[in-house]
Amino acid sequence: MELEQREGTMAAVGFEEFSAPPGSELALPPLFGGHILESELETEVEFVSGGLGGSGLRERDEEEEAARGRRRRQRELNRRKYQALGRRCREIEQVNERVLNRLHQVQRITRRLQQERRFLMRVLDSYGDDYRSSQFTIVLEDEGSQGTDAPTPGNAENEPPDKEGLSPPRRTPAPPEPGSPAPGEGPSGRKRRRAPRDTRRVGAALTPELAPIKVEEDFGFEADEALDSSWVSRGPDKLLPYPTLASPPFD
């Protein structure tokens, strides 16, 4: 009995000496000034806050991915637009080149017609023709039958520079040769069909106005000028007589 009472007293004394209520001065001091527990608590709080905000991170990632997809689609759309614009620009450049070539061709045709008209006016003036006071009848042709080289009536560029009120002369095909048979005449008496040819070349070959007409002033020699020795060596019997030109005496 005594032994049990003594052990109980020692246990009671030991408990009272080494145990103390919370908040008393006998409590052991925290390690490192108690900062370890505070840092652990802060880490736990940060981890908890990060775990609670996981849905926000996912939403932000989804928004960034959607923005990248929109930018990628916009770049692809811009690339297609640039390619379409490049093709359209090349087509327009080709059309402009063709139009420019056609413009140069029309300018050459216009200059040729003006030169022919001036030459014709000079020839008519040299013959004393009163063509300025005459009346011209202009026959309007259909667009399908009108040639590309035919001048347009009333065009200011085709009119002579110093002559006012002068209409473009009518172009008439050259008369057929006397020896050639008529289209309806022949062994069979039927018309011959020919393959269609280029109207521009045919018109240029049939219209005598397109070929330049030479006059005496265009040859550049005088009437009393001596002929070359090659002409003299042929003899007078082989030379054609020219009554308007004075031939030099033969030795």
From Swiss-Prot:
Signal peptide coordinates: none
Q: Name one GO molecular function term.
A: protein kinase binding
Q: Which gene encodes it?
A: TFPT
Task: Return the protein name.
Answer: TCF3 fusion partner homolog
> Tell me, how does this one assemble?
Interacts with NOL3; translocates NOL3 into the nucleus and negatively regulated TFPT-induced cell death. Component of the chromatin remodeling INO80 complex; specifically part of a complex module associated with the N-terminus of INO80.
Region listing for Disordered, in residue ranges: 50-72, 142-213, 228-251
| Phosphoserine PTM positions | 167, 180, 188, 247
Function noted in UniProt? Appears to promote apoptosis in a p53/TP53-independent manner. Putative regulatory component of the chromatin remodeling INO80 complex which is involved in transcriptional regulation, DNA replication and probably DNA repair.
- Keywords noted in UniProt: Apoptosis, DNA damage, DNA recombination, DNA repair, Isopeptide bond, Nucleus, Phosphoprotein, Transcription, Transcription regulation, Ubl conjugation
Q: Where is the composition biased (Pro residues)?
A: 170-181
GO cellular component terms, A-Z = cytoplasm; Ino80 complex; nucleoplasm; nucleus
| Classification via InterPro entries | INO80F (IPR056513), TFPT (IPR033555)
**In-chain residues carrying the UniProt-annotated modification Phosphothreonine:** 172, 207
**Cellular location of this protein?**
Nucleus
